[in-house]
């Protein structure tokens, strides 16, 4: 749809939509214009707009859309400003009717109409000079107006009662979201007639910080109002209307009116108490029992200059209020947290306006939290003394040290910290303010902890604790003013240190005879800079059950700069993690992980003892893990075992070294990058353990300078030799007896783990070299192809040839390195096997079981077609050790009696024979291949030549079929397993039947064929051969070889005499 003037239509829509919904009328108007601009017909636009606007307007949607299209068609929005659309709500209609009839019935001065109506009307002009009317003049005006108002009062009371019963979901006639002038007028009217206070008009007009009347006060109150207070404000306005209407009634209604006002105040006080449940109450409402009513009245003292009395004189109004005397009023102003007290306030009872208040942002009457209102959250959470409302935000990162309040734990040695806490806190209202201190004394801000001198303000006494200090605002301008009701003090010396944990330092009593317990308790443990704790006298041991554990003579650790870590998680026990944590304490000269072969131990060495001592005494969890234990590392190899003590709570961790038990709250800070850099080494732990101590920094730097390959070789070649040294050094250093068998088992386990790690590293390097070699080969192949395509005179030919030469040299070098690595690894493995302890003598039953397992493994490997040479050698070795003959020899004794010895005897004499292949493999080596075309016979033959040497082949092109005889059984097995697929065609392969010669009287068939029929089929008769092959296809297929092997092994088991069957 094409619109003539979008701006005027938007203004018209804003006015129409404002009473219809709670959404922003201007934003909704823009949305409606965007819908209107769609290229649709009127019918489609109406349907779309009804669907889209239903969520905003609900039952008024259809009516609004019809009116909108009528206005667009008649161009009404261009000429006539739209009146708000009257809703169908009965409550709104009732309230509009009340306002209109009130305007028609009340025939009196504009002031009286203004006091009654809550409809939209311009606010009265403010008056600069407020003149307090005489009491007699007020009585005359009252008498002259009674006749005119008598008839209207009953109607006003009745209609006001109807307005009070409007449902909560109905839209009131006055919406606080509309304009600032409405807010000003409603706040002004509300404050004029709802509050009956003894405060003079001049003072009430001058105080703008209470957020009541006047343009400034109303705007401030509107800015700080939140959604939780909106329903309450609506109820207050309706209650104000009812209160004003009844304020003109006769004197016999005053007792009832007072009771109703009292009930409202009690309800407001209970609502305020419920609002601050489970939260810290604001400072001005600490004692709600005594001052809830006064605070209720004082919050509503407006700043409108038109605050003159209208009905009754001052005396009658003062009699009905719960106000205080001028002296108590001045005292309350003195304790108020959002006003500066003056000396004249408690001396002059006349209604003199106080000086302008100090302008700091948080002067809201409800003591709202400024951070919560402006930022949406407050980092103090439930510890904040200011109001967060009924739905506070829970800040999950409250334990973050960078967000916590700048305060430390309670310090009992702070001077005069409890001086002001003996009586009731200032501002509590339970007694007079404590006498002012001397000018030379100091006061402590209860929140920031600042120590500030007491000064006189405007010639009066010192500011109480609750009054904000401008110095505090200069220091922290974003914080709200301090609360008056904070009886707990803080350490004034801990302003700059973030609070980490509430750890209470426990002093250690001196062992010297002159040191008293009281003096030790007074002494504070300060941070040491460069002085070691060697100057501290010798401490006596505390009881054994103390949580601090026994003390250690600090003279032992005065030159120690190494810390030992235990129970470090394996994922965190790395040089990078440890360096990131300990670099903040000083310069690190060495980090050793997996100390003594323990993957959960580490050694961190600092450049000086002072740095190591600061790291040791830090209360911060190492790597954010409380289970990690930190001990002083003992350089001696067990010489001072008698002087070592175990640390309490060490978790059974062997040789734990003690240190000073001072508590030091180190400030976590970003570590400064070290100019020299940390010299870190990862030397061989077993080698250093064999020496019994950690290497010196020079030695460790030398180890760092060594190449990685040398360190790897050192780790692998000296693992076995240093194992005994590690065991010898570990036993005295641990301070506890070890079982020799358990110690040997643990050392062997550590050696195996280290060997696995070395092998994995070597395999990774070898794999990387192989990949590099393959990439070089590809590059060289590409270069050769490029050279072949080039002409002889091509200028690029010479550089390409040079590149090929370089690649060839690199490939040769890589091959040599790979071969050298393999030889080195093989030599290391042989050396480790030689260094291993001799195996325990196995019993005969164990040897038989192992022989059986090995034979089963041999059968399984043969079924899979894998190389079984190593397994056969191991099987033969086991048979020689057990004294039995091999399966092949047992079979040969049956087939060849000319050997002249029974199977058992031959087996026992076997170790005297020369080693080598002494048996004949008589298994079938010929296969029959079918399933191809006759013209493909030659190609199929070439295909099977890839699997080994073919000694004989026979081609029958009529069937067609191919009979192949391989030189070895292994080649035939490979052909059966891997030669089934040929050019996406599956060939059918089976073992050819074996032709046996004329049977001798004592001889038996060598092997049983896989075919189920007669085995006397001759190779010269191919038809019978094909028929036997077709009969055995069901058994052969893809699993031909394993099944044949199983049958062969079953025949072997039946024909030979096994050792375990005896």
Curated annotation (Swiss-Prot):
Zinc fingers (C3H1-type): which spans?
363-391
What GO terms fall under cellular component here? nucleus
InterPro entries, A to Z: Nucleotide-bd_a/b_plait_sf, PWI_dom, RBD_domain_sf, RBM26-like_RRM2, RBM26/27, Znf_CCCH
The chain positions of domain PWI read: 7-75
Kindly give the Pfam families that the UniProt entry links to this protein: Nup35_RRM_2, PWI
Q: What happens when the gene is disrupted?
A: Recessive lethal. Heteroallelic larvae are severely developmentally delayed and most have wing disks smaller than wild-type. Heteroallelic adult flies show defects in wing hair orientation. Defective alpha-1,3-fucosylation. RNAi-mediated knockdown in the eye results in reduced FucTA protein levels.
Q: Where is the composition biased (Low complexity)?
A: 197-207, 823-840
Q: Compositionally biased, Basic residues: which spans?
A: 234-249
Question: What are its GO biological-process terms?
Answer: mRNA transport; positive regulation of gene expression; positive regulation of RNA export from nucleus
Which residues lie in Pro residues bias regions?
Answer: 423-438
The UniProt GO MF terms for this protein read: mRNA binding; RNA binding; zinc ion binding
Q: Where in the cell is it found?
A: Nucleus
| Compositional bias per record (Basic and acidic residues), positions renumbered to this chain | 172-182, 264-273, 294-310
Tell me the ranges covered by the RRM domain, including all copies. 561-635
Residue ranges of the region described as Disordered: 119-145, 171-340, 416-463, 666-704, 716-741, 822-847, 886-920, 1004-1062
PANTHER family given in the database record: RNA RECOGNITION RRM/RNP DOMAIN, ZINC FINGER PROTEIN SWM
Function statement: Negatively regulates Hedgehog (hh) protein signal in wing development. Regulates neural-specific glycosylation by binding to FucTA mRNA and facilitating its nuclear export in neural cells.
What is the official name of this protein in its record?
Zinc finger protein swm
Q: Which organism is it from?
A: Drosophila melanogaster
What gene is this protein translated from?
swm
């Amino acid at each position: 749809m094409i619109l003539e003037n979008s701006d005027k239509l938007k203004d018209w829509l804003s006015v129409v939509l404002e009473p219809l919904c709670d959404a922003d009328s201007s934003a909704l108007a823009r949305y409606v214009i965007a819908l209107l601009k769609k290229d649709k017909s009127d019918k489609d636009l109406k349907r779309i707009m009804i669907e889209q606007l239903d969520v905003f307007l609900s039952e008024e949607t259809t009516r609004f859309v019809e009116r909108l299209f009528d206005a667009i068609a008649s161009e009404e929005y261009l000429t006539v400003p739209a009146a708000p659309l009257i809703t169908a709500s009965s409550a709104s209609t009732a309230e509009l009717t009340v306002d209109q009839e009130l305007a028609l019935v009340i025939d009196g001065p504009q002031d009286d109409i203004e006091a009654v109506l809550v409809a939209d009307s311009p606010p009265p002009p403010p008056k600069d000079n407020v003149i307090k009317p005489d009491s007699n003049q007020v009585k005359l005006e009252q008498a002259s107006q009674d006749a005119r108002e008598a008839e209207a009062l009953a109607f006003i009371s009745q209609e006001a009662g109807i307005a009070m019963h409007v449902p909560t979901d109905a839209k009131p006639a006055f919406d606080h979201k509309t304009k600032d002038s409405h807010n000003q007028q409603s706040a002004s009217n509300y404050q004029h007639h709802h509050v009956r206070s003894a405060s003079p008009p001049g003072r009430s007009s001058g105080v703008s910080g209470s957020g009541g009347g006047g343009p400034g006060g109303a705007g401030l109150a509107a800015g700080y109002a939140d959604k939780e207070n909106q329903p309450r404000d609506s109820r207050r306005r309706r209650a104000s209307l009812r209160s004003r209407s009844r304020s003109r009634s006769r004197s016999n209604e005053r007792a009832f009116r007072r009771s109703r006002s009292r009930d409202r105040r009690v309800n407001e006080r209970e609502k305020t108490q419920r609002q601050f449940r489970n939260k810290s109450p604001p400072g001005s409402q600490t004692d709600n029992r005594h001052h809830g009513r006064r605070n209720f009245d004082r919050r509503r003292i407006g700043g409108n200059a038109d605050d003159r009395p209208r009905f009754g004189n001052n005396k009658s109004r003062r009699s009905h209020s719960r106000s205080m005397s001028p002296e108590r009023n001045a005292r309350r102003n003195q304790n108020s947290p959002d006003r500066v007290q003056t000396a004249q306030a408690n001396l002059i009872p006349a209604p003199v306006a106080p000086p302008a208040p100090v302008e700091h942002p948080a002067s809201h009457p409800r003591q709202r939290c400024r951070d919560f209102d402006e930022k949406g959250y407050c980092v103090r959470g439930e510890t904040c003394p200011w109001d967060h409302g009924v739905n506070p935000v829970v800040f999950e990162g409250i334990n973050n040290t960078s967000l916590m309040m700048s305060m430390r734990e309670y310090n009992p040695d702070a001077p005069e910290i409890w001086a002001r806490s003996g009586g009731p806190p200032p501002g509590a209202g339970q007694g007079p303010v404590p006498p002012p201190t001397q000018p030379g004394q100091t006061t402590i801000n209860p929140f920031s902890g600042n120590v500030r001198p007491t000064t006189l303000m405007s010639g009066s006494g010192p500011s109480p604790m609750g009054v904000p200090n401008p110095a505090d605002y200069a220091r922290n301008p974003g914080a709200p003013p301090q609360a008056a009701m904070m009886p707990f003090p803080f350490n004034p010396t801990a302003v700059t240190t973030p609070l980490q944990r509430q750890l209470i330092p426990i002093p250690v009593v001196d062992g010297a005879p002159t040191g008293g317990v009281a003096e030790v308790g007074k002494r504070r443990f300060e941070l040491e800079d460069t002085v070691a704790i060697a100057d501290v006298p010798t401490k006596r041991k505390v009881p054994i059950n103390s949580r601090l554990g026994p003390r250690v003579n600090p003279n032992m650790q005065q030159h120690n700069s190494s810390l030992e870590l235990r129970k470090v998680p394996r994922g965190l026990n790395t040089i990078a993690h440890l360096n990131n944590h300990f670099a903040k304490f000083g310069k690190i000269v060495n980090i050793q992980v997996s100390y003594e072969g323990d993957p959960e131990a580490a050694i961190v060495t600092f450049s000086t003892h002072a740095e190591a001592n600061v790291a040791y005494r830090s209360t911060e969890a190492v790597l954010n893990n409380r289970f990690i234990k930190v001990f002083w590392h003992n350089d001696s190899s067990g010489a001072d075992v008698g002087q070592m003590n175990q640390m309490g709570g060490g978790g059974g961790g062997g040789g734990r070294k003690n240190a000073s038990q001072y508590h030091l709250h180190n400030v976590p800070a970003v570590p400064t990058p070290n100019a020299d850099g940390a010299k870190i080494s990862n030397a061989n732990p077993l080698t250093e353990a064999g020496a019994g101590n950690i290497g010196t920094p020079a030695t460790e730097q030398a180890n760092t300078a060594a190449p990685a390959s040398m360190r790897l070789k050192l780790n692998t070649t000296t693992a076995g030799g240093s194992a005994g040294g590690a065991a010898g050094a570990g036993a005295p250093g641990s301070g506890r007896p070890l079982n020799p068998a358990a110690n040997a088992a643990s050392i062997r386990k550590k050696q195996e783990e280290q060997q696995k790690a070395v092998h994995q590293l070597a395999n990774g390097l070898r794999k990387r070299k192989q990949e590099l070699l393959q990439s070089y080969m590809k590059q060289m192949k590409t270069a050769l192809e490029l050279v072949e395509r080039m002409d002889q005179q091509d200028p690029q030919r010479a550089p390409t040839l040079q590149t090929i030469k370089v690649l060839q040299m690199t490939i040769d070098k890589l091959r040599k390195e790979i071969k050298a690595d393999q030889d080195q690894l093989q030599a290391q493995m042989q050396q480790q096997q030689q260094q291993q302890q001799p195996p325990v003598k196995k019993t005969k039953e164990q040897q038989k079981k192992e022989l059986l397992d090995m034979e089963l493994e041999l059968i399984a490997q043969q079924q899979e077609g894998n190389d079984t040479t190593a397994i056969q050698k191991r099987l033969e070795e086991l048979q020689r050790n057990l004294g039995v003959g091999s399966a092949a020899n047992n079979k040969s004794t049956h087939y060849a009696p000319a050997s002249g010895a029974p199977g058992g005897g031959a087996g026992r004499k076997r170790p005297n024979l020369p080693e080598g292949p002494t048996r004949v493999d008589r298994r079938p080596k010929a296969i029959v291949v079918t399933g191809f075309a006759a013209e493909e016979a030659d190609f199929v033959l070439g295909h099977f030549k890839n699997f080994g040497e073919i000694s004989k082949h026979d081609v029958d092109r009529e069937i067609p079929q191919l009979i192949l005889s391989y030189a070895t059984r292994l080649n035939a097995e490979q052909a059966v397993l891997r030669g089934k697929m040929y050019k996406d065609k599956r060939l059918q392969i089976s073992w050819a039947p074996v032709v046996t010669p004329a049977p001798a009287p004592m001889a038996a068939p060598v092997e049983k064929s896989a075919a189920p029929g007669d085995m006397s089929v001759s190779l010269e008769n191919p038809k019978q051969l094909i028929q036997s092959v077709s009969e055995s296809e069901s058994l052969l297929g893809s699993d031909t070889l394993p099944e044949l092997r199983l049958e062969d092994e079953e025949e072997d088991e039946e024909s030979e005499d096994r050792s375990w069957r005896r």
